[in-house]
């Protein structure tokens, strides 16, 4: 376990908090009005923490409807670049025209990095709408931090993550006062003890001897049982060879075990895996469906559309994203769904 202790009793940046949620009281109309008023009245950069993908979309639509289109040359050129290389109807394209970016865990990393760079430039992006991805390996800050939503995905925002987010307000030697606008009630202040256990889902890829100090007795027993099962199914020599060759690209022990059993018991049905290397993508269907069924309910789309997506995406070495999207349109997969499935 790790425990954090305060050793220094001062802040390099003062955080000026505005608890607007006390007046908003959960009213979505008042919250939207408050956000627009903040953006209209403040100077400097604004980081808008939306918390979830659906609320990024909600905030984005609000800004597209209410912020004017900018004539700044760099913004105009960036929006044109997004139109050519992605989609002219995309939410991000329309936001970029209004000096606003998006940061989440689904966008291409290079695209996120470009937006952070534009946000940090003096006179390009004024705002960025984000999920908690903005505090995950991203070193950026803003004079204004607006907490639109007190969630982190499906979970309530915890005190540790909340402080990380509002800690992006202000920057030493640049703007010493960070303005924090709370549109929803923040989590209660709580002492933080960070405990990072190994989740059971990754036990199939862990050396029980190397990490025994971090594993529970039950987890060690599960790893030993898993290895015995795999040796019985595949044979010890074959299993060891696969481990050394890093063949397992999934660390979920339950999934690996069920797949090994399925292939062992129904060998004829799994004949032809080499067809997945075929240039004829129409030969992939049967095996793609079989693989999908091994993890039912995890695909967030009809199986037939996911299979179509895989087949079309395989052409990404020779086709542009707009060309891929044109084909995916037949399966009702737009650019947002594209990033989600990718």
Segments from the language model and where they lie:
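A broadly tuned preference for mixed-charge, low-complexity surface segments
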Residues: 89-109, 177-198, 235-250
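Conserved helicase ATPase motor motifs in RecA-like P-loop NTPase domains
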Residues: 1-4, 51
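Conserved segment of the helicase C-terminal RecA-like domain
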Residues: 144, 151-199
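Ser/Thr-glycine-rich phosphate-binding loops at phosphate-binding pockets of nucleotides
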Residues: 1-2, 128-134
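Conserved C-terminal RecA-like helicase domain
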Residues: 9, 15, 22-127, 142, ...
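Short hydrophobic alpha-helical runs that function as membrane-insertion/retention elements
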Residues: 129, 146-147
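The feature captures the C-terminal accessory region of ATP-dependent helicases
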Residues: 8-9, 27-33, 54, 58-64, ...
């Amino acid at each position: 376990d790790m425990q954090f202790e305060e050793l220094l009793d001062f802040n390099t940046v003062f955080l000026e908090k505005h608890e607007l949620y006390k007046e908003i009281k959960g009213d979505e109309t008042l919250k939207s009005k408050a956000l627009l008023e903040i953006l209209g009245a403040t100077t400097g950069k604004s980081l808008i923490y939306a918390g979830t993908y659906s609320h990024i979309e909600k905030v984005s639509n609000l800004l597209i409807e209410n912020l004017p289109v900018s004539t700044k040359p760099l913004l105009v050129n960036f929006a044109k670049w997004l139109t050519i290389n992605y989609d002219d109807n995309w939410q991000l394209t329309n936001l970029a025209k209004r000096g606003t970016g998006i940061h989440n865990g689904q966008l291409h990393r290079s695209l996120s990095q470009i937006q952070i760079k534009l946000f940090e430039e003096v006179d390009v992006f004024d705002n960025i709408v984000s999920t908690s991805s903005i505090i995950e390996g991203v070193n950026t800050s803003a004079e204004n931090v607006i907490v639109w939503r007190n969630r982190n995905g499906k979970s309530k925002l915890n005190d540790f993550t909340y402080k990380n987010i509002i800690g992006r307000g202000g920057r030493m030697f640049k703007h010493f006062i960070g303005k924090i606008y709370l549109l929803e009630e923040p989590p209660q202040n709580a002492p933080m003890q960070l405990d990072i256990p190994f989740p059971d889902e990754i036990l199939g890829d862990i050396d029980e001897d190397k990490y025994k100090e971090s594993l529970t007795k039950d987890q060690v027993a599960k790893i030993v049982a898993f290895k015995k099962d795999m040796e019985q199914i595949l044979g010890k020599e074959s299993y060891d060879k696969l481990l050394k060759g890093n063949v397992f690209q999934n660390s979920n022990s339950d999934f690996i075990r069920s797949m090994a059993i399925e292939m062992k018991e129904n060998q004829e049905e799994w004949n032809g895996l080499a067809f997945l290397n075929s240039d004829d993508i129409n030969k992939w269907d049967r095996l793609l469906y079989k693989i999908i069924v091994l993890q039912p309910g995890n695909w967030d789309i009809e199986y037939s559309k996911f299979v179509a997506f895989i087949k079309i995406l395989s052409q990404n070495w020779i086709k542009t994203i707009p060309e891929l999207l044109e084909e995916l349109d037949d399966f009702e997969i737009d650019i947002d769904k594209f990033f989600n499935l990718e």
